[in-house]
Amino acid sequence: MKKYILALDQGTTSSRAIIFDKEQNILGVSQKEFTQIYPNQGWVEHNPLEIWASQYGVLQEVIAKTNITQEEVAAIGITNQRETTIVWDKNTGEPVYNAIVWQCRRTAGIIEELKLDKEFSEYVKENTGLLLDAYFSATKIKWILDNVEGARERAEKGELLFGTVDTWLVWKLTNGKVHVTDYTNASRTMLYNIKELRWDERILEKLNIPKSMLPEVKNSSEVYGYTNLGGTGGVRVPIAGMAGDQQCALFGQTCFEEGSVKNTYGTGCFLLMNTGEKMIHSKNGLVSTIAVGIDGKVQYALEGSVFVGGAVIQWIRDELKLVTDAADTEYFAQKVEDNGGVYVVPAFTGLGAPYWDMYARGAIFGLTRGANRNHIIRAALESIAYQSKDLIDAMQEDAGCKLTRLKVDGGASRNNLLMQFQADITGAEVVRPIITETTALGAAYLAGLAVGFWKSKEEIAEKWAVSQSYSPNLAEEKKEKLYKGWKKAVKRAEGWEEE
């Protein structure tokens, strides 16, 4: 009897495995952290074999822990850190280099060179939906081919394969039989034409990347292959769903309709809006990406990210030592009625969308003699909501629609003061679901739909339940005054590092 879906959630700092039942209850979770490698300033790597070992380890652990049998697992769904790049030998399975992680800035020089070709920059934006940036996979592959001895020659002979983390996991789970990715992960490589749904020859040629390295692009929900979960029974379990982490969170939040939006409050914030079958080109520095691909049809999304979201709370705790526990920020922030005119702009590494200012730096503005610890803590929390509002306003303008409801998840979404302020400052209802494991849940949904475990998106949406909702409760005049203060503070922080 098929009773469960196993979701593999391969993140930037840890690998997790979660078991869901048909009612979307979580039966068990296993998690294992793995090594972050920093060979040079601004470089970030992972060992691909350690990614695999940690992911396979938690898969076996969660099955043992929950005492379920392989026969009871209907399917496996995969969600993953996006853009991270792995190149390996297709005969031996040995990686030729460490995985180059999405955060890694080593290819910034290659990007600057490419940007000199204005026509090419425009072509990339128009056809991949992305801005030329070291964040995406394309220049990471080029770097490996150019810098690892013999790599280019081997790639041209068809001996090397490229994959994002989803591709690597499926390849390992199927013992090297299956080399695939899904539409969402392909859309983050900067090599995939999201209008025509194909690898883009012009970009491949410009970067000198052999097409033979690339995986086949499949739906986000279909059976890609089978794996044996390591028992003696030899039961073959289908691997049936796959999408990048932010797209999975959008799907896990049941944002199936055009115009629906979710915000994940993690270290940074990731805001995605489903734009349906329309690919919208942002005029506000957002990227266009594929939200999901099912039955050969894709839905698109607009995506914006805040570099420093929950990380501002860590800064308050670890560097300023204003609290000993991140959860205490709510308690102290509530001790004051408002921010007392204080604004924190956490531009520690510059500002992302819609500003895109790499030279902005963090600052605290509006201090008076009466400003105290609580005002600074409150202003830090509010900065997360202001930055999210900046993105929401940009999205509304690009999509030509008004947001009435924002679905939220991620660690900082548990902070009630922050969520209430988010509702107040955006004028939209903010909704937190009962299951906040939305990324893994999205992967489970995709896999479950492919094998008939759940019959339809409608069945899934019916089971999606609200834990708490926050309605806007701030006078328009007060809202405008607060936001105007934020805009003024950002203006002062911009361009700080420039000579």
Swiss-Prot record:
> Which pathway does the protein contribute to?
Polyol metabolism; glycerol degradation via glycerol kinase pathway; sn-glycerol 3-phosphate from glycerol: step 1/1
The activity regulation comment is: Activated by phosphorylation and inhibited by fructose 1,6-bisphosphate (FBP).
Residues the record lists as binding glycerol: R82, E83, Y135, D245, Q246
Might you give the EC number(s) for this enzyme?
A: 2.7.1.30
Q: What Gene Ontology terms for biological process does this UniProt record contain?
A: glycerol catabolic process; glycerol metabolic process; glycerol-3-phosphate metabolic process
Broadest EC class?
transferase
Q: Name one Pfam family in it.
A: FGGY_C
Residues binding sn-glycerol 3-phosphate: T12, R82, E83, Y135, D245
Q: Can you supply one Gene Ontology CC term for this chain's record?
A: cytosol
Q: Name one GO molecular function term.
A: glycerol kinase activity
**CDD domains in the record:** FGGY_EcGK_like (cd07786)
**Which residues are noted in the entry as ADP-binding?**
T12, R16, T267, G310, G411, N415
Q: Which InterPro entries match?
A: ATPase_NBD (IPR043129), Carb_kinase_FGGY (IPR000577), Carb_kinase_FGGY_CS (IPR018483), FGGY_C (IPR018485), FGGY_N (IPR018484), Glycerol_kin (IPR005999)
Q: Which SUPFAM superfamilies match?
A: Actin-like ATPase domain
Q: Which residues bind ATP?
A: T12, T13, S14, T267, G310, Q314, G411
Q: What does this protein do?
A: Key enzyme in the regulation of glycerol uptake and metabolism. Catalyzes the phosphorylation of glycerol to yield sn-glycerol 3-phosphate.
For this chain, the family text in UniProt reads: Belongs to the FGGY kinase family.
Subunit relationships = Homotetramer and homodimer (in equilibrium).
This one is known as Glycerol kinase
